[in-house]
Each structure stands twice: as structure tokens, then as C-alpha cells.
């Protein structure tokens, strides 16, 4: 019998792309599986041209056992105030999701029986469990971040619900550390993302976190060799969650990005081909990472002082009070130090949107200054490129702590991990700090570089036949089949 799974990603490139890739892994591994990915459109003000192009490309890529269904944008525009209302926005799509799944479950030809086997929902789409329950099928979760942050999230919820301990009371502490079972080192509270330190957000987040336990299993975009402490926690008898399957690294590694025909990007890739091995530092801060003029100048000064070749993905952050993806700077000469572009013309390239995986794959790249988004972190490890951490928002502070302090797989740019792109005030990183981080990152014989090379090899092995993630994915497919038998 053929089995049908419904995948529901959260809006946003960082959630949609990994879920698409893990769906492809599923259909590649089992000929009896078919998957429909139901795509929820971005909230008003968050969509970008790259994201729209990617979704359009998916619609044309549908095949017999992997199809895509893009839902309609609600007639009433959603509020620009996204703080507690994001989950309400997702919840509004439940009727459309139900109608879409009803069409999937219509009786087909008698000679090709298929059965709905379950929903795989994104970590921010837990309310879709209600729809799965209406169809009488199990739900599973895909966690786009790492196992360590999953462990932190459920531990903080446990403290809140069981121990009556509210970590947001520690918001202003710069010295308090918390023992968490998914790490071997105490985690400074200053590394917590703002969502866990804001009383307004905690009840909203924990309503989602509690529902993790309603699933039959959790797929995590990591591999067992990378996060042994977290996986030890989840595999123990006291684990607070259902089975956790490590199926990563799951990445979209297409060399051609959505703007691959762009002359500027093609020029940068050609330029990289002409540079010595491991001589170029790459600075890129994700789909939501941008800077204002003051910080851009400090980065420019640091790059020039360091003397290293560079590729810099530079975009303008939204004005304070606005939310949305960063925009292109219209005139770099106006915001960068006078004469910078001329003085660095032979050793550096600046671009807006960057084809990140194509750049990281180039042998000329010797280091990666990153916001520590989990997808970017996995890409840096996959390509064996050491990373300097500059977390900006969400769980990136925790990712940075894990990579630098817990695993020794990165160096830090800043001494404090506190930061958030929605904070009221910017914390300016000085040119001296940035230069120091770049010089440390680009050391050719560092222990970090050696450890990254070793972990890169392990990441590839994990996905091979018999590798830890390959075995976990097969186990998940077996369990899906067993759970509907």
C-alpha cells in the first residue's frame, strides 16, 4: 500500500527550504511514500523576491510522489504587529489545510490504493495537529533548529510549568548561568533569545512547546555526532519528548541561487576562482540580517585593517520599528569610509543577496563570519569552513554558544552574545572587535580549523548508507508505517 504524508512548513525560507529537502529524502528512500507539501504564504511585509521566486520554482517542480500546494493569502491583511499574533496567523490557515487534505484523501482508482499516514508539521505549526486529529492520523514535528535548542526549549518550559521558575525574571542578568541537560557547560542567561526572556512571549511559546509531546516523533535537522550531549538527553529514560530522529544535515545545496543569472554574483564567483585557497573571508548574515550605516562602516574598517581578501554580503536593516527583510543599499560610497571601495577593489567584493552555498563551496573561502542561523551553521560545517559567530536574533545566541564554547567549532566576533534585531537599541560592534575576530578566524593552523574539518567529514558520513542520519530516517519511515498499521 502506498502511504501519503502531508508536510506543513512555517512561512520563511529558513523553515520552508529544509522541510522541502527532508521531504525529498523521504521519497528517495521509500518508493511507497508520497508527500504533499502545503505552503503557507509569508505574513505581510516579510516576503522577499528570493522567497517568492523559490516558491514559484517549487510549483513547477511537482512530480508524481512529491507535490506542492500553495495556500491563498487571507483576504484581510494581517497586522504589522507580529509579536503575539504570528501563531494566530498560522491558525487561520487550518480550514484551507483541511480542505486540501480532504482532496488528497478522495478515493482514487481502485488499482492504486493509498492511505494518509500522518502530518509532519514545522515547529511553529503545532496547531495543525488539530487538523491531523480530525483525519485520525498521527502528527510528527520537524524541528528546523538543532537538538540543543530543542532541549533548552523543553527544559525552560519544564521549569516554568513544574518548578514555577520563570527564566524571564533573569532578563537583566549578565552573570547568571543555567544548567541545562542538553549541554555539558552552564548556559549564560545572556545567551538566551529574547523570546525566552520576555514575559509577553513565554506563555505563547510554551503553548506550542507543550504540544511537542502530542506528536509521535520529532525530526531534527542535525546529526548525532555533532550533538552527542543533547541526543544522550533525548535517548534517556527521562526524556520529556517522543522519539527524536536526527536526519541532518538537511540543506538546499543548489549552487545556482534564485538570482544566479545576476552579473554581479557571477562576477564574484569568477573572482573567487582566481584567489588562493583559503585566503578569502566571507561575511553573510542570513535572509533577515542587515546593518545600519554606522555598523557597516565599522565592518569596512575592520576588513581593510585585517588585510584579508573578502566577499561581503551587505544589506540595509529595516528602520527601527519596522519588520521585514533587509533591503539593498542604493549607494555604497555614501555609507562606507571614503575611498574604501577604491582601496579594496582588488582584494574584496561586496554584494547584496549572496549565493551562500556556492560561495562556501569555493576552495578560496577560508572563513565565514555568520549570524549563526542553523542552516548557515550546517552549511559551514558541510563545506569545512570555520565560522566566526555574530548572532543577531532568534536562537542564534544559543547556536553561537554551542559552536564556540560547547563544541569548539567556531570563534567569536563579539565577547557578548546578547543581541536581537528587534531590540530597541543597537549594540555597535567596533572595528577592533571585528578585526580581532577575522584574524583569529583566518589562522590556517588553528585547532578550530582542524576540528571543523573532522566534523565536516562526519557530516557527510551521516547521510551515507549506514550513517547515523540515514539509519534514523529509515527508522522514522518504519515507525510511520507501524503507527498506522
Swiss-Prot record:
Effect of inactivating the gene: No visible phenotype under normal growth condition, but resistance to hypostatin treatment.
Keyword Metal-binding in annotation: no
Enzyme Commission number, as recorded: 2.4.1.-
GO molecular function terms listed in the Swiss-Prot or TrEMBL record: UDP-glucosyltransferase activity; UDP-glycosyltransferase activity
Pfam families: UDPGT (PF00201)
Ranges in a coiled coil: none
Enzyme class label: transferase
Keywords: Glycosyltransferase, Transferase
Entry similarity comment: Belongs to the UDP-glycosyltransferase family.
Protein function: Glucosyltransferase that glucosylates the cell wall inhibitor hypostatin in vivo to form a bioactive glucoside.
Protein name, entry field: UDP-glycosyltransferase 71B2
Organism listed in the record: Arabidopsis thaliana (Mouse-ear cress)
Amino acid at each position: 500500500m502506498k502511504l501519503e504524508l502531508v508536510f506543513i512548513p512555517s512561512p520563511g525560507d529558513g523553515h520552508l527550504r529544509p522541510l522541502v529537502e527532508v521531504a525529498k529524502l523521504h521519497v528517495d528512500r521509500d518508493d511507497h511514500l508520497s508527500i504533499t507539501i502545503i505552503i503557507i504564504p509569508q505574513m505581510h511585509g516579510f516576503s522577499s523576491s528570493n522567497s517568492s521566486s523559490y516558491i514559484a520554482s517549487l510549483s513547477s517542480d511537482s512530480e508524481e510522489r512529491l507535490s506542492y500546494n500553495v495556500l491563498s493569502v487571507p483576504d484581510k491583511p494581517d497586522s504589522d504587529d507580529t509579536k503575539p499574533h504570528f501563531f494566530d496567523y498560522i491558525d487561520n490557515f487550518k480550514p484551507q489545510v483541511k480542505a486540501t487534505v480532504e482532496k488528497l484523501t478522495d478515493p482514487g482508482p481502485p488499482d492504486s490504493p493509498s492511505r494518509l499516514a500522518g502530518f509532519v508539521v514545522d515547529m511553529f505549526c503545532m496547531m495543525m495537529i488539530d487538523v491531523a486529529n480530525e483525519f485520525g492520523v498521527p502528527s510528527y514535528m520537524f524541528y528546523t533548529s538543532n537538538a540543543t535548542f530543542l532541549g533548552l526549549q523543553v527544559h525552560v518550559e519544564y521549569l516554568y510549568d513544574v518548578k514555577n521558575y520563570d527564566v524571564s525574571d533573569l532578563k537583566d542578568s549578565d552573570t547568571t548561568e543555567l544548567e541545562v541537560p542538553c549541554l555539558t557547560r552552564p548556559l549564560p542567561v545572556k545567551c538566551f533569545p529574547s523570546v525566552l526572556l520576555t514575559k509577553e512571549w513565554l506563555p505563547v511559546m510554551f503553548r506550542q512547546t507543550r504540544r511537542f509531546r502530542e506528536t509521535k516523533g520529532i525530526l531534527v535537522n542535525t546529526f548525532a555526532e555533532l550533538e552527542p550531549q543533547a541526543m544522550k538527553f533525548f535517548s534517556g529514560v527521562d526524556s520529556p519528548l517522543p522519539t527524536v530522529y536526527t536526519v541532518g544535515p538537511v540543506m538546499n545545496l543548489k549552487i545556482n541561487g534564485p538570482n544566479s543569472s545576476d552579473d554581479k554574483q557571477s562576477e564574484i564567483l569568477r573572482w573567487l576562482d582566481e584567489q588562493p585557497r583559503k585566503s578569502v573571508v566571507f561575511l553573510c548574515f542570513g535572509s533577515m540580517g542587515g546593518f545600519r550605516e554606522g555598523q557597516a562602516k565599522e565592518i569596512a574598517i575592520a576588513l581593510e585593517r585585517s588585510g584579508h581578501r573578502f566577499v561581503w554580503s551587505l544589506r540595509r536593516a529595516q528602520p527601527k520599528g519596522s519588520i521585514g527583510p533587509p533591503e539593498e543599499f542604493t549607494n555604497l560610497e555614501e555609507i562606507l569610509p571614503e575611498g574604501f571601495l577604491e582601496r579594496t577593489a582588488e582584494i574584496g567584493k561586496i554584494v547584496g543577496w549572496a549565493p551562500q552555498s556556492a560561495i562556501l563551496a569555493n576552495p578560496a573561502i577560508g572563513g565565514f563570519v555568520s549570524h549563526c542561523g542553523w542552516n548557515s551553521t550546517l552549511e559551514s560545517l558541510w563545506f569545512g569552513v570555520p565560522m566566526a559567530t555574530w548572532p543577531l536574533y532568534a536562537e542564534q545566541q544559543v547556536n553561537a554558544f554551542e559552536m564556540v564554547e560547547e563544541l569548539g567549532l567556531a570563534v567569536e566576533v563579539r565577547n557578548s552574545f546578547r543581541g536581537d534585531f528587534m531590540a530597541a537599541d543597537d549594540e555597535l560592534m567596533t572595528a577592533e572587535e571585528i578585526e580581532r575576530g577575522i584574524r583569529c578566524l583566518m589562522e590556517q593552523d588553528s585547532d578550530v580549523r582542524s576540528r571543523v574539518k573532522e566534523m565536516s567529514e562526519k557530516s557527510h558520513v551521516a547521510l551515507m548508507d549506514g550513517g547515523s542520519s540515514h539509519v534514523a530516517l529509515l527508522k522514522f519511515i518504519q515507525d510511520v508505517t507501524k503507527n498506522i498499521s
